[in-house]
């Protein structure tokens, strides 16, 4: 009898106890190894800081967010890792991915599974132009690069060179993945619409080990402005071989990627990259009155990782992830309808985030308020020079 009463008492206690809070798993899908690992890891760091801050304030829908990593070393592995995260880890959503090709591949998997995919850094048009219901992008995309680059050519670079922008001989060179081809396509369109003179448009394999023939082609075309869309290794290779070949155009303009990385400048030499331009997500040498919260992010980053941010990709992922997670905290569940309800309600004006740009998701689930910054390498540092409201320095001519 005594044993029976004890058993009943224990059962009653267990029945009356509140169930333990279950963590919410989210995928963190980036290239953590392979040629894109540096920017992949840098992007993931921003997501990690955002999740830590959200969890410190109670999590999402009362539960802690736990990130589960997936290594998207290439497109095929991105597909395999997305499947694993969904079917084995049972994630409620996937954040990623930095690489456009990997994002396109992996997001198709999540769409078919009905799992939301939140892109925080990849820029290819097709990520959000396919009309997929469960794929959202918080960051600017390929068109925004090209628009800002051509605008800078007309309003800043050509006047500084003492030339009419229509007298410039412009070359477009790009790595041949979704990232490079998307940006280059828009550059060609905007250059044509502006009536500017494009003398060469040429792609190359992203894993190339020799760009000397491309440098010769640029010389032969008489290009005095080069627009390059590239990751880190090909950015370094082009800058090195152009310098070695004595090719010194009046302006080199990168579209993010390797041109936004301090390790790129360190690898080629600060004198080689001096005065090169870069259009990309917000970086750190910027008028912080335009980017509230940026300085606090930098301090959080240094505290967690023991170094300063290596690129603005961490900031971009951080801001996008926080906006999305805070929105999800206002609904119940993570099904397609709940996510749509949460993100459709997001309405943040420009100048209110650490990126400077605002947030509002359009009919394709693209943040239509996302925008780029124009920067230049000066004295070994990447500083903002455009738009004027965000600039901290005037542009310089190469020596």
UniProtKB/Swiss-Prot annotation:
Keywords: Amino-acid transport, Signal, Transport. Residues 1-22 form the signal peptide. One of its GO terms (biological process) is amino acid transport. InterPro entries: BCAA_transport, Leu-bd, Leu_Ile_Val-bd, Peripla_BP_I. It holds the Pfam family Peripla_BP_6. Belongs to the leucine-binding protein family. Component of an amino-acid transport system. This is Leu/Ile/Val-binding protein homolog 7. It comes from Brucella suis biovar 1 (strain 1330).
């Amino acid at each position: 009898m005594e044993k029976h009463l004890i058993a009943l008492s224990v059962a009653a206690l267990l029945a009356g106890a509140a169930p333990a809070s279950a963590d919410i798993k989210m995928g963190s899908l980036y290239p953590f190894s392979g040629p894109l690992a540096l920017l992949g890891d840098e992007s993931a760091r921003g997501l990690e800081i955002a999740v830590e801050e959200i969890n410190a304030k109670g999590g999402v829908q009362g539960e802690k967010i736990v990130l589960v990593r997936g290594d998207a070393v290439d497109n095929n592995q991105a597909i395999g890792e997305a499947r694993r995260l969904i079917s084995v880890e049972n994630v409620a959503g996937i954040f990623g991915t930095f690489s456009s090709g990997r994002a396109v591949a992996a997001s198709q998997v999540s769409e078919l599974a009905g799992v939301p995919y939140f892109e925080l850094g990849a820029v290819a048009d097709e990520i959000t132009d396919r009309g997929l219901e469960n794929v959202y992008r918080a960051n600017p995309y390929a068109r925004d690069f090209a628009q800002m680059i051509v605008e800078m050519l007309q309003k800043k670079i050509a006047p500084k060179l003492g030339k009419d922008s229509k007298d410039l001989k412009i070359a477009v060179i790009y790595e041949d993945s979704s990232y490079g081809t998307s940006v280059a396509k828009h550059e060609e369109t905007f250059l044509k619409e502006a009536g500017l003179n494009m003398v060469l448009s040429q792609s190359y394999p992203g894993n190339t080990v020799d760009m000397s023939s491309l440098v010769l082609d640029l010389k032969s075309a008489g290009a005095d402005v080069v627009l390059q869309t590239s990751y880190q290794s090909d950015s370094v290779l082009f800058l090195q071989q152009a310098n070695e070949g004595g090719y010194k155009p009046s302006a080199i303009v990168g579209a993010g990627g390797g041109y936004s990385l301090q390790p790129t400048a360190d690898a080629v030499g600060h004198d080689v990259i001096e005065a090169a331009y870069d259009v990309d997500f917000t970086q750190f040498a910027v008028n912080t009155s335009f980017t509230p919260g940026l300085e606090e992010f930098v301090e959080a980053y240094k505290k967690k990782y023991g170094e300063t941010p290596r690129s603005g990709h961490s900031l971009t992922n951080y801001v996008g992830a926080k906006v999305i997670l805070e929105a999800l905290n206002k609904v119940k569940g993570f099904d397609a309808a709940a996510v749509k309800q949460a993100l459709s309600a997001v309405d943040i004006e420009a100048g209110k985030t650490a990126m400077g740009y605002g947030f509002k998701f359009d009919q394709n689930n693209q943040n239509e308020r996302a925008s780029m910054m124009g920067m230049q390498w000066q004295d070994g540092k990447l500083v903002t020079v455009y738009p004027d409201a965000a600039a901290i320095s005037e542009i310089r001519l190469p020596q």
